[in-house]
Amino acid sequence: MRKHSLDRWLLTAVLVVLLSSSSSFAAKKDAKKKKKSNKEVTYDGTSLIIDGKRELLYSGSIHYPRSTPEMWPSIIKRAKQGGLNTIQTYVFWNVHEPQQGKFNFSGRADLVKFIKLIQKNGMYVTLRLGPFIQAEWTHGGLPYWLREVPGIFFRTDNKQFKEHTERYVRMILDKMKEERLFASQGGPIILGQIENEYSAVQRAYKQDGLNYIKWASNLVDSMKLGIPWVMCKQNDAPDPMINACNGRHCGDTFPGPNRENKPSLWTENWTTQFRVFGDPPTQRSVEDIAYSVARFFSKNGTHVNYYMYHGGTNFGRTSAHYVTTRYYDDAPLDEYGLEKEPKYGHLKHLHNALNLCKKPLLWGQPKTEKPGKDTEIRYYEQPGTKTCAAFLANNNTEAAETIKFKGREYVIAPRSISILPDCKTVVYNTAQIVSQHTSRNFMKSKKANKKFDFKVFTETLPSKLEGNSYIPVELYGLTKDKTDYGWYTTSFKVHKNHLPTKKGVKTFVRIASLGHALHAWLNGEYLGSGHGSHEEKSFVFQKQVTLKAGENHLVMLGVLTGFPDSGSYMEHRYTGPRGISILGLTSGTLDLTESSKWGNKIGMEGEKLGIHTEEGLKKVEWKKFTGKAPGLTWYQTYFDAPESVSAATIRMHGMGKGLIWVNGEGVGRYWQSFLSPLGQPTQIEYHIPRSFLKPKKNLLVIFEEEPNVKPELMDFAIVNRDTVCSYVGENYTPSVRHWTRKKDQVQAITDNVSLTATLKCSGTKKIAAVEFASFGNPIGVCGNFTLGTCNAPVSKQVIEKHCLGKAECVIPVNKSTFQQDKKDSCKNVVKMLAVQVKCGRGKKN
């Protein structure tokens, strides 16, 4: 028995040792693996250094709350395919802590999920923490409750603001650390930003502003997270913060890093101009963007971020004052996440060209030559080697210029830069687009646009409301960001002897408002509405009225279009009606601001009851819409989801101003009655993400402020970019895709490097029709080409032969392809090839 016991004991001991050794080996292996995945991020005067390697960084801003989690994977994937290796995002304090101490990291607020998706795609992350972000986002990302902290002043050396900011900053960064998302932990976050464009307000706070910036710098630096930190538009950023540039042309406007050991970083290269209600269409050409990026990299830049790369949607009430629901739609990826060509493709080619220059840019010695008034040569080379890259710039906006460099002559197009990754071969020119173009189409849905059965519920105009103020309550403080709407009521008496009797003398109500909009009623009669604009928020509403002897009752509805998102002393910004008077009385002007008490309440009854949801619908009595309704009316109907899987929109034809919900989800604010100088609404289509929709019986609820609208004119549409074009000149540089870099030499991938035009349909679609083709001097843009005075007659025939029925086609751009009889009726014309095709799925489309 003792022997058997001893044997068992020995066996157990051996097993313990073996298991212990195995566990120890596994632990060491895991530790080694973890250590290997951790990346140290440092920097010097040339670039960021990630895991010991210098990097050129092409980054794009994508904001997680401005798209849905279902959209994130495709948006991030397309960003990577566009040549980006980094995604930049703000962190939105008022999204994550809408109420003090109550946090939200779910749905569109799931920051961790968003960052992990970026990591899954093998990309880096730049985290712009705030606390203030601007971003055309309501209140600049600061939560409303912060305004009500006693004694607080935002963004300065203020105890209360710093205490709340530190708590927020530590909460976010601790969360990132817990999820091991910093590069030093093996995560994708390589760079952080604290504060945002502070120099714009610093002067207002004097020494307190300087103290605050130093405090913010010390706060993030003290957390020792293993990543560098930047401050944008902050040339005096304290060490170790890296001062970075924001703007359109940082290659010319950025004074450079404030220390020799800091790299040149560009945190915002604006891809377009954000739009506000009342704006006409605006755009920034991709040629200008490409020129600015090439120039920045030619002048020691090693990081650029496109703001925005995908703008997305300001869902619900999240936009800043007057900002449209659609955000940065002209970015390389449009509001729906579709590739906007040629902006997407031309920048992708730029990134390819810069990558061919990577070694010279990061390790070469910079040199500059100025051969002419409008020309410049910047190049990087390593003496004694073949490593060399050059940027030949022509700043003449009217004419091409010839530049002689290293024994060769190069013709450079007007206001452009040619990139030579070996100082010999031109692989890219910023003004010569060889990538395809697209035109976006909104196709009326057959499935969703069945006859709508609208039902309506109209808000009741309040009578006398409780209140003791002789001055109308400030509207931001009244609504507390719970609603866009605040009611004001007052009563005033007019003696019959004070009513005008003289012919031509009339009485008027005048309301001076600080913004944003208002509606007014006198004695139950609707007087009308007024509004300011993004540039001029204050306005005066004046209307002729009929007063009665005795008591008169005035009702005003103050309307917000979002909170301000910029400027100093934001916590003291005011809006809403401020001065109200009655003009035309024989006794003189009656100032209701001083002589009457004002009652208040906030919001619509429908909002409080949640009648934009299925559950809330039952709480009020809906009536059938008979074709006409007053203002402040709710409209509801049901619709089936639009066909296909394409992005869906609602077009708000016939409507005025208000809010949209689908299945309880806030689509955003619309404002069709605020026309641009072109006589059109700034935004017509409003994005309904597919994740908001069910196959059938989707609830549409609209709150409309204005009377006599026509909801029957609204419709649903699906979005595509099935109109695909090319516009290539015969003297253009062939695509950079022909080139690669091997053993420090730029080499052609193919035997024949020739100029071609490429047309490619999205998904599984194929080219179904050639809608336009001309080799000559055609004019116009994709979606609207016309023939010029010169055209090869066989142009369409050639394109049809190359392209019909194919998902992708490549067309040689040369005279021999289009002038098969070798006759050229316009020899002195430099030929352009313009092609427009339609993609589809045949009869099933």
UniProtKB/Swiss-Prot annotation:
Residues 751-840 form the SUEL-type lectin domain. Pfam families: BetaGal_ABD2, BetaGal_gal-bd, GHD, Glyco_hydro_35, SUEL_Lectin. Its EC number is 3.2.1.23. Residues 1-26 form the signal peptide. One of its GO terms (cellular component) is apoplast. Keywords: Apoplast, Glycoprotein, Glycosidase, Hydrolase, Secreted, Signal. CDD domains: Gal_Rha_Lectin_BGal. Gene3D superfamilies: 2.60.120.740, Galactose-binding domain-like, Glycosidases. One of its GO terms (molecular function) is beta-galactosidase activity. The keyword Signal applies. The active site is at 197 (proton donor), 268 (nucleophile). InterPro entries: BetaGal_gal-bd, BetaGal_jelly_roll_dom, Galactose-bd-like_sf, GHD, Gly_Hdrlase_35_cat, Glyco_hydro_35_CS, Glycoside_Hdrlase_35, Glycoside_hydrolase_SF. Its main location: secreted. The keyword Secreted applies. GO terms for biological process: carbohydrate metabolic process. It catalyses: Hydrolysis of terminal non-reducing beta-D-galactose residues in beta-D-galactosides. Glycans are attached at residues 104, 269, 300, 395, 752, 784, 814. It is found in: Secreted, Extracellular space, Apoplast. Transmembrane segments: none annotated. Belongs to the glycosyl hydrolase 35 family. This is Beta-galactosidase 11. The gene is BGAL11.
